[in-house]
């Protein structure tokens, strides 16, 4: 699971790295630098429908059709396949069939801006955290994500939220005893 990550890079550096502009909707209430982004926090993303704009969304995905708000932080690329988290798995990407994610994975993908992510061994979890940076030292980098818009029927508030797409553990995470890895992208 990639349930926590770091985002402390300045807006100007993110704009340069991702070739985007933070518009008025972002700069009016930008997410603060955060060394422990977790579900419910606002964080910067770049969406496929607005690839030139830096946007702020809530970490913790809720699909548009949901009756109540969820905080799904991860979307498994394999869906229900590979239940044992076999790092050698090369089968179907079941995320395309999961009702929770199938619409967003097709039409609402995003880049999640991160400086590092935080993981722990499968047994100790975040009681023994490791901060994982990109191997080449590039900061910030992009994690693959999906997003959606959900309207709170009680308040009418529109909540734009995202989840990080995960896959089987990379060599680095296997070495610390973790079973999943966020999908890293080159922006």
Regions picked out by a protein language model, each given a short descriptive name:
Residues 1-187:
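Short linear sequence motif anchored by a di-proline
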């Amino acid at each position: 699971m990639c349930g926590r990550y770091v985002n402390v890079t300045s807006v100007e550096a993110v704009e340069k790295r991702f070739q985007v502009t933070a518009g008025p909707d972002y700069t009016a209430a930008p997410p603060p630098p955060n060394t422990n982004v977790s579900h419910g926090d606002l964080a910067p993303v770049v969406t496929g429908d607005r690839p030139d704009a830096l946007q702020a969304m809530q970490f913790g995905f809720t699909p548009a059709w949901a009756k109540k708000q969820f905080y799904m932080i991860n979307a498994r690329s394999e869906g229900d396949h590979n239940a044992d988290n076999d790092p050698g798995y090369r089968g179907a990407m079941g995320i395309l069939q999961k009702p929770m994610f199938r619409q967003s994975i097709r039409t609402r993908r995003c880049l999640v801006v991160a400086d590092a992510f935080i993981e722990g061994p499968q047994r100790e979890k975040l009681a023994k955290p490791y901060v994982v940076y990109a191997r080449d030292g590039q900061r910030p980098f992009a994690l693959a994500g999906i997003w959606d818009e959900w309207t709170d029927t009680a308040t009418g508030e529109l909540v734009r939220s995202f989840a990080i797409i995960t896959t089987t553990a990379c060599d680095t995470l296997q070495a610390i005893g973790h079973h999943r890895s966020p999908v890293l992208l080159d922006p």
